[in-house]
C-alpha cells in the first residue's frame, strides 16, 4: 500500500509497497477514504521525525477487518478515528495511508448524513479538547454542572477551539473566546457567548471586566507570548488555571503565582508513554485512555443527536501525493479557521 512516512532526510516522503499493519486485539483495520491535516502533523515531523513511520492523526474510512474482542464495529461500518503518526514505538500507527489501524475505543461511527471528508476532521479535536478541559494537566473541569461559569478559549476559531466551545456548552459552562472579528460569527455558531478581538491591546483586561474579575479557567489553543499574557490579564484577581496545547513561555508563566499553568500532549490519550525527547515526552497515563474511551462513546452519541458538529473544512484534491503541500501551508500559517481535508479514494 502507499503511505506518507518520515523521510530519512527530514519531512515526509511518499512510500510504495508499505505492508498493511497487523491487527492487535481491540483494533480495527480501515480502508481510508479521507484524511485531515493538523498543525501537529507539521510540528512532529519537523522536530521529532521518525524515518519510516507513518504520519497523520485524523482519518475516516470503512472497516475491512476487526481484531479480537472488538464489539462496537463490524466490517463495512463507516468510522472516523484518531491515531498518532511519527510514533517511534509503533511505526505502523498513522493516518496518511491507504489502510490505517485504529483502536475500537478511540473511534466513532459516522452518521449517515455525514461525508468521509467531514468526519475525518473530528478525531484529534475531540481528543485534544476533551483532555484540555476535563483532565490533568488540563483544566480538570466537571463534565456536568458548570452552572454557567465563564471559561476562556483563546483561539476560538481553531479546530480544537470550536470543539472546546461545544464541549463547554454541553457541560454547562459559558464559553468566552478570542478570535479575529471576521471569525466572530463562526465561533458564535458553535456556541460562543461573546467574542473578543485578540488584536486589541486591552483584550485581556476587557475580558476580566466582562467576566466580573471572576474568570478562573483558560484554554489557550494558539500559545505564544501574546496569548499567554492576554490570558493572564483576563484571569481574575483570585487566580486560576491556564492550559496550553504547546510548551508555554516560561518568561510569562511565573509572572502570576496565583495561576497554575501547564500544557498537554494529546497522544497521552493512548494511555502509553509518549516517547519524545525532553519536555515533549510523557509517561504512561492509563487514566487518559480510560477517559478517552468514555469521551469517544459520548462524542458518538453527541454527533448522532446533533450536539456537536465538525469544524469548517477545505477539500483539496491529489490524495497522499498532495498532503506535503498542505503541510507547508500549515507551516507558513496560511490556514485559518478551517481544516485541510484530502479524499483518498471513492
Curated annotation (Swiss-Prot):
Q: Which residues form a coiled coil?
A: none
Query: What positions does the entry give for substrate binding?
Result: 124-131, 266-270
GO MF annotations in UniProt:
nucleotide binding; oxidoreductase activity, acting on NAD(P)H
The organism's superkingdom is given as Eukaryota
Query: Which residues make up the binding site for NADP(+)?
Result: 40-43, 157-160, 180-183, 198, 245-246, 335-336
Q: Show the InterPro entries listed in the entry.
A: ADH-like_C, ADH-like_N, GroES-like_sf, NAD(P)-bd_dom_sf, PKS_ER, Trans-enoyl_RdTase-like
Task: Describe how expression is induced or repressed.
Answer: The fujikurins gene cluster is specifically expressed during rice infection.
Role this protein plays? Trans-enoyl reductase; part of the gene cluster that mediates the biosynthesis of fujikurins A-D, secondary metabolites playing a role during rice infection. The polyketide synthase PKS19 acts with the trans-enoyl reductase FFUJ_12240 and the polyketide transferase FFUJ_12241 to produce fujikurins, however, the biosynthesis pathway has not been identified yet.
Question: What name does the UniProt record give this protein?
Answer: Trans-enoyl reductase FFUJ_12240
Q: Which source organism does the UniProt entry give?
A: Gibberella fujikuroi (strain CBS 195.34 / IMI 58289 / NRRL A-6831)
